[in-house]
């Protein structure tokens, strides 16, 4: 009887241990299943591995109007005008196709075969919104997409008068500072919730949202930033030399083409306030804003860049000032 009791006790203990082991495994599996992937980290890894355009010498992808003019008969160039239908009707580049920004992905996937072209050129009013959506298309994997420098403002003077020529100013030039501000400490990451687990699928969802959002929602006026610098995290997207010679108060300098990667300074961008980016023209920074918006940062582009508040300084130093010398008198289709 004693031996039987010992045997039964042994079997009972073995069963308890075995059951506990299964329970632990089940709990681990349950916890593993219930823990969703960090979508920001998955997306960032995917972009830096496959679509790292913004941190490469290829950015920004600006094309001069002269090259577009020279290739109007070139079937390897596809020109897309993203302005409103009324402005397109008023005057557009020969052979251009009018496509609204929200329809660009559909146009690329269903209306054309992008790989058949050497260059696909987006055109807008000033070059800024075209740069933004070209940036999104680059992120989507279309490496032959460019934006026309200065937009239609460089094509004919009446377009320039409605855009660039009335938006350059030196009114705030006396308020720039030369103080060197340190980057913020690394903090929290953006929260992305697409419900997807793979980088490509997350990117697709983010791109669809970005194309559906009007570019105007990313525009910030320089006057507002000067008036309320504490409201924003201000990035001066110029080289250190230009930064040292004058920038928006409280702006922090970030190196173009290299600083916004996980191995550099990307994680210093805050998630509790809007990040606004300033460059010479607003075009180069529009590409950056597109990238950061896709990653989940709340990002704004200072309209017309430094041309909007220290135009004379840019002109005197040959730092990318827009002038009438940038305006051509090329023909349009009306």
Spans of features found by a protein language model:
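Bacterial N-terminal signal peptides
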Residues: 9-17
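Post-signal peptide N-terminal segment of secreted/secretory-pathway proteins
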Residues: 58-77, 82-112, 117, 121, ...
């Amino acid at each position: 009887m004693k031996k039987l009791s010992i045997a039964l006790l042994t079997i009972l203990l073995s069963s308890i241990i075995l059951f506990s082991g299964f329970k632990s495994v089940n709990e681990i599996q349950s916890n593993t299943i219930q823990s969703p992937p960090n979508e920001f980290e998955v997306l960032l890894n995917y972009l830096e591995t496959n679509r790292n355009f913004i941190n490469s010498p290829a950015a920004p992808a600006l094309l001069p109007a002269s090259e577009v003019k020279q290739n109007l008969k070139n079937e390897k160039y596809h020109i897309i005008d993203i302005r409103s239908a009324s402005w397109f009707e008023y005057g557009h580049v020969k052979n251009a196709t009018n496509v609204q920004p929200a329809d660009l992905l559909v146009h690329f996937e269903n209306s054309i075969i992008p790989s058949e072209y050497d260059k696909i050129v987006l055109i807008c009013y000033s070059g800024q919104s075209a740069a933004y959506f070209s940036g999104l298309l680059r992120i989507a994997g279309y490496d032959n997409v460019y934006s026309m420098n200065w937009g239609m403002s460089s094509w004919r003077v009446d377009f320039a008068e409605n855009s660039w020529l009335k938006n350059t100013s030196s009114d705030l030039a006396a308020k720039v500072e030369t103080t060197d501000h340190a980057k913020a400490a690394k903090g929290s990451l953006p929260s992305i919730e697409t419900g997807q687990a793979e980088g490509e699928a997350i990117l697709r969802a983010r791109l669809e949202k970005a194309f559906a959002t009007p570019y105007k929602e990313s525009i910030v006026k320089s006057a507002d930033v000067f008036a309320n610098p504490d409201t924003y995290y201000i990035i001066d997207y110029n080289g250190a030399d230009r930064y040292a010679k004058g920038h928006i108060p409280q702006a922090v300098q970030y190196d173009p083409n290299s600083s916004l990667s996980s191995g550099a300074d990307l994680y210093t961008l805050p998630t509790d306030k809007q990040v606004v980016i300033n460059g010479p023209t607003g075009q180069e920074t529009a590409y950056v804003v597109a990238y950061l918006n896709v990653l989940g940062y709340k990002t704004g582009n200072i309209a017309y860049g430094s041309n909007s508040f220290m135009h004379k300084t840019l002109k005197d130093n040959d730092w990318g000032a827009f002038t009438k010398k940038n305006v051509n008198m090329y023909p349009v289709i009306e």
